[in-house]
Amino acid sequence: MVDFLQALVLGLIQGLTEFLPISSSAHLRIYPELFGWGDPGAAFTAVIQIGTEVAVLMFFRKDIWRIGRAWLLSLFKPEYRGHLDARMGWFIIVGSVPIVLLGIALKDVIEEDFRSLWLIGTTLIVLGLVLGVADRLGGTDKTIKQISLRDAILMGLAQALALIPGVSRSGATLSMGRLLGYDREAATRYAFLLAIPAVIGAGVFELKDIPNGDNLYGWGPTIVATIVSFVVGYAAIAWLLRYVTTRSYAPFVLYRVALGAATLVLVATGVIAA
């Protein structure tokens, strides 16, 4: 029963933090340590992220259907190849390549060295400041309809940084999008779509490690956490898309810096283990 209660809390944390630029993987590493539960493991973290990505699939189902259909048609009908949705399909595929290749190449490092709270606290602060600068200096004249192959590659490279817990997949992509001149809504929407292949792929790949490996929980608690993350994540998407139409990322920047600094202090004083 304790495992299920812990999984429920972790699913709630995942759902609340996955789409905000504050790093869900960092929260799933930091808060279990604060609660005395220990590290839930990279496999658990990757698998419950499937729940939030299913929320993306549901929320953007019309966009995804339109993009997928146009992309498939473009493979056989030349007249579709210049269509925005067909190009968007290619941009998402190309933008996913960096994180897939690096994720496979650095798997052992990601599951061990990258989970150090020293590193996570530092990346929360540094990438939080980067997000703040990007949001402050970035233009607001480009919409998602103006995305180019170059921009898709650059945002894909930025997303790959999120293999380090504390960076934040959405935070890295949003930062690059804002620096490239996209408005907040466009950068946010594209960040959600770009994450789908990588996150679902990583979650499926890690399914084999749920009953063993470094995972603290079995199938039951993991399924509970995944369902909770889906429900909460769906609500978080709707809220964030409304929020970014009128407000800046400043509150997220302040929160990241505060959490990162607190994490480093707690580790340095021995309150929690690195």
Swiss-Prot record:
Pfam families noted in UniProt: BacA
Compartments, record wording: Cell membrane
Topological type in the membrane: Multi-pass membrane protein
Transmembrane segments: 40-60, 90-110, 114-134, 147-167, 190-210, 221-241, 252-272
GO molecular function: undecaprenyl-diphosphatase activity
Superkingdom: Bacteria
Record's keyword terms, sorted: Antibiotic resistance, Cell membrane, Cell shape, Cell wall biogenesis/degradation, Hydrolase, Membrane, Peptidoglycan synthesis, Transmembrane, Transmembrane helix
Record GO biological process: cell wall organization; peptidoglycan biosynthetic process; regulation of cell shape; response to antibiotic
Main enzyme class: hydrolase
Entry EC number(s): 3.6.1.27
GO cellular component: plasma membrane
Reactions listed under catalytic activity: di-trans,octa-cis-undecaprenyl diphosphate + H2O = di-trans,octa-cis-undecaprenyl phosphate + phosphate + H(+)
Family: Belongs to the UppP family.
Other facts: Bacitracin is thought to be involved in the inhibition of peptidoglycan synthesis by sequestering undecaprenyl diphosphate, thereby reducing the pool of lipid carrier available.
Role this protein plays: Catalyzes the dephosphorylation of undecaprenyl diphosphate (UPP). Confers resistance to bacitracin.
Entry protein name: Undecaprenyl-diphosphatase
Gene name of the record: uppP
